[in-house]
Swiss-Prot record:
Organism from which the protein derives: Trichodesmium erythraeum (strain IMS101)
Name under which the protein is recorded: DNA repair protein RecO
Pfam entry (one): RecO_N
GO biological process: DNA recombination; double-strand break repair
UniProt GO cellular component terms: bacterial nucleoid
Taxonomic lineage from the root: Bacteria, Bacillati, Cyanobacteriota, Cyanophyceae, Oscillatoriophycideae
S-S pairs: none
Length: 288
């Protein structure tokens, strides 16, 4: 008799398997990332029905198998159906789901990661369906917020408050329109521009690997202030007043940082790019 176990899980990925089955990648708080078969879920009258769709949270009864475990029963707790009703929301949700699949552990409890992902998916889902500048700014801001928190839980979030070279705290200077600070992906965060010589000295003391350390981009005061919001549990209401382009730059910076430190190219990020291009005429003609 097959051994049974219970788990709560959110569907992150689904692949067709055989004639009517589906192979699901699921994040559970109890067992981390698991891959299980949802038998017959692609049949029109399947007893599992929509429980095998993406971003559905189920209470599961699973039977152990030789190679793959199988879902015996599934009861839906909640689902983020609103994500599929808007291309931007769907792209953002898939982006976070793909990132989670790279950082989640298998056969280990992932309670904090499970709740964190659900929290950010819910925020994105609850955004009102619009295509104006304000809505798009909030979408990218919420996505960047989720990315940062996932990196933080993995212990690899970029340093956004202290200079990576000196450890000194950096504050954006809004009174100087030319004020900038550097961001180094391999050094791990922000660097005061006039501290580049310190960076080189700092790197030589560590290893030859760090000799290639460089400032990848310069960011202005507003962009730094946005980065410095990301560690907070909630974004400030300033998100309604900030530049759409600044949030796009923050997301792209986090994307490059994430891909570098995980050694993985985030495929779902292309969906975000496609979406932003599709609405760019509306964004360019809109005002907040």
């Amino acid at each position: 008799m097959a051994k049974l176990y219970k788990a709560t899980g959110i569907n992150l990925k689904a692949m067709a398997l055989g004639e009517s089955d589906r192979l699901l990648t699921i994040l559970t708080p109890e067992y981390g990332l698991i891959r299980v078969v949802a038998p017959g879920v692609r049949k029109q009258k399947s007893k599992l029905g929509g429980r095998g769709e993406l971003f559905v949270v189920n209470q599961l009864l699973i039977s152990k198998g030789r190679s793959l475990d199988r879902i015996n029963q599934a009861e839906t707790i909640t689902s983020y159906t609103g994500l599929s009703q808007n291309l931007g929301k769907l792209a953002a949700g898939q982006y976070l789901a793909e990132l989670v699949q790279q950082i989640a552990l298998k056969e280990n409890p992932q309670t904090e990661l499970f709740h964190l992902l659900n929290e950010h998916l819910e925020r994105i889902e609850q955004l009102q369906h619009k295509t104006d500048r304000l809505w798009s700014t909030q979408l990218i801001a919420f996505l960047a917020h989720g990315i940062y928190h996932l990196l933080a839980i993995e212990g690899i979030a970029p340093q956004v408050h202290q200079c990576c070279a000196t450890g000194n705290e950096l504050q954006p200077d809004f009174n100087n329109s030319k004020w900038q600070v550097g961001f180094s992906i391999d050094a791990g965060g922000i660097i005061k521009v006039d501290e580049t010589s310190v960076v080189q000295s700092f790197c030589k003391d560590l290893s030859d690997y760090y000799l290639s350390t460089k400032i990848n981009t310069l960011i202005n005061a507003n962009q730094l202030s946005l980065l410095q919001q990301l560690p907070q549990p909630q974004l400030q209401t300033i998100v309604k007043l900030t530049s759409y382009q600044d949030w796009v730059k923050v997301e792209q910076l986090l994307r490059k940082y994430t891909q570098y430190h995980l050694g993985y190219s985030i495929r779902s990020a292309e969906l975000i790019d496609t979406y932003l291009k599709s609405i760019s005429p509306l964004i360019n003609n809109a005002t907040i």
